[in-house]
Amino acid sequence: MRRDTTSWFSHNLGMDMPLVAYGHAGYPLLMFPTAAADYLEYERFYLIDSIKWFIENGLIRAYSINSVNKYSLLNKQSHPGWKVEMLSRYDRYIMEEVLPLIRNECGEDARPLTTGASLGALLAANTYFKHSDNFRGTIAMSGSYDIYSYLESYYDDNVYFNNPAMYLKNLNDDYHLPRLRQADSIVIVTGQGAYEAPEKSVELSNILNSKGIPHLLELWGHDVRHDWEWWRKMLPHYLGKFCQQ
């Protein structure tokens, strides 16, 4: 399996941001790490191995990036306003730096699929829902899609525009909403076992239903924990469905 790493100083984030790409061809998959982890987390925990068949057969080219969660939502020393400012800067980093790199390698019209587990599911879903004109869809695993609990009741525009549970409820425009209503690749999946919060996925699904946005909500069994062994089953399962479309 081809594996390429690169890094550059992000003008949006003010720090070096490494990236790893797996594969020689295929549909681009942008991967957001869990919690405060780094761009190699999915390799260390064998999630990349779980989708190796798709990569080696030229169906998927996977791009894994760093998160900024340790500077934003998970930084208990930071003011909530700074936490969400970092999320907005991260969004600009994706759109202005990562997406052009992917399109340079996969074609100028490429619309990547996003994915992530746990806190990575929030980032993957948020990126897609904010930019459905530039991304194809999302496979969000074991996520929670309301950031308000991290912010000590703080509120500003950055909170609103980085919180899918907020902005999707009020989406009523003639640009983004029609595109989302044509979606064919939104997957919201979670287990119902230890440390999972299936009600968070159901909440997001209810919002999407209220807006007429097609999606797949799947609640795996009560034995399915918030853990790697299950994400290694979920991602190849839904990538298989995506590649058959």
Predicted segment positions?
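Non-catalytic cap/lid and distal C-terminal segments of serine-dependent acyl enzymes
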Residues: 1-245
